[in-house]
Amino acid sequence: MIRRPPRSTQGVSSAASDVYKRQVIYKAIDAKVDLLIVHHGIFWEGAQKIDGALYKKIKASIDSGMAIYSSHIPLDVHSKFGNNTLMAKAIGLKGGKPFLEWKGLKIGLQFEYKIKRKQLIKQIENSINGKVHLAPGGKETIKRIGIITGGAGSEVKAAAKEGIDTFITGEGAHHTFTLAEELGVNLIYAGHYLSETFGVKKIAAHIGEKFKIKNTFIDHPTGL
């Protein structure tokens, strides 16, 4: 039987984006998307056996002709499309400076910004359209804010060394709550998923505008 060429070899007429890839792949296929842009890709470091659920997802993508593009850390730290930059902008922060080096990249942004803690939380919740969880280790009046989106709660110690009194991230292990209290830092968990929606949305919108194609965001929240 002769199969038609995959859609991805015929040009892209529609794009969709999401933070994760798992069930979103099937949603994108059902929506007849040509290009799926995700933050967390299919493959990570090292060799990986392709079987079970992973095999099914890859096969479904190939059979449908849908291309998948993923960008993890580079998307977190990008100066224009990055999660850190875009979340900061949505909160109302400007003039950030990079901090915390990881494998040659500065993965965080810090800001001099005086604000009451209650007001900052309100601005963050407005930016993500959701609720945050606070470890109230620092003072009510905030002077320096650090941001690393995703699962960077364990970096609260590095943030404290930078003189950051309020650290915003997505999530962290249980011990990071008490660690923040010990360090005298306000640690704000904004949700791993919600804090990483900014970049993929921006890229999809940019591609849609530049190439005049339909783009959409496939929301598949985890609540974490």
Predicted regions and their residues:
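Single conserved hydrophobic/aromatic residue that forms the stacking wall/gate
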Residues: 1-16, 20
